[in-house]
Each structure stands twice: as C-alpha cells, then as structure tokens.
Amino acid sequence: MSKKDPRDMIGYGSKDQKIKWPNNARIAVQIVLNYEEGAENCVLNGDNNSEIFLSEIIGAQPIKGRHINMESLYEYGSRAGFWRLHKLFQEKKIPITVFGVGMALEKNPEVCNAIIEANYEVASHGWRWIDYQNIKKTEEKKHMKLAIQAHTKIFGNRPYGWYTGRCSPNTRDLVMEDGGFLYDSDS
C-alpha cells in the first residue's frame, strides 16, 4: 500500500450513521440563497474582464469591457429573483440562510432590510464573488476583513458562517486564523 492520501476518501464507509433528527424526521433540508449580484467580475468594479462563471450564456468568454448581457443576468437576481424567492419563503414560512457577498449587499439596502425583517441567517460569502485561486493571501485576507466589516455594519453582528465558494489554497487557513466563525461551508 502506498503512503496515506491527504484527502479523506473513506468517510464513515460501511458503518451505519445513527443520526436522530428532531421529531424523528427522516431528512433535514437547508435552503441557501446566494446573494452575489454586483460583486462579480465587472469592469465597473475595476476588473479587467466581465464575469464568465456560472452563466446562462453557454461558452461565455471574458470581455475586456462591459458585457451588457452578463451584467443583465446578474442584475436580474437583485431586481427580481431575490424578491420572488423572498416572497415565496415568507408565504410558506420557510427559514433560510443567505450567503451574502459584502460588496453586493452594500449595493442593495432594500434587500438587506428584507433579510433583517425576515430574520434570515446570513453567512458571509466574502467581499467579492470572484475566483480566489490565484489571489495573493494578503489580498484575500483584506477581502475577508472587508466582508466581515460590511456584514457587521449592515446586520449589527459579525457573521457566524463563512462560504467563499471559489476558494484558494489559503482560504481555510484564513478562516481558521480569523477564528470567529462557527462553521465554514467550503469544507
């Protein structure tokens, strides 16, 4: 057998997990709404290119300039998508978690007020919705601090949860160094 793999490829394996949910429920469901609109790659945010990741535009390529169609896709989420889902969750009394990107939240106080009034849990989804894979550790740390500051200013407390989404090799270390989170959804 070769050396131990640093990744856990086994988990709990064939051992049966004895999980007991409240009221003998057989399944637990958590609904998460990602709020990223306005913090994606965009020349208006000082970026060199437009966003291309997770787009409805098949085969999207970065454009060195404004990509009006891409911007419109993201703007839909803040203008209409959030509100449609929010109304549904409120009507059905469904509690949710919002993964909120700091820059995006700062751009839409009305959405933030709705989140506060609904008493949704809000986990920080970073300062920007960008790929941190090749971002310097110092810059990623700065973005983490900006995200925590924005969250604290908007919601009155620092976030309990963290989710970068497109993390770097440094992300987990930075989350641990900060030490103020109860959970890390990138794990």
Functional labels for PLM-detected ranges:
Residues 2-187:
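Catalytic alpha-helical scaffold of carbohydrate-active enzymes acting on polysaccharides/glycoconjugates
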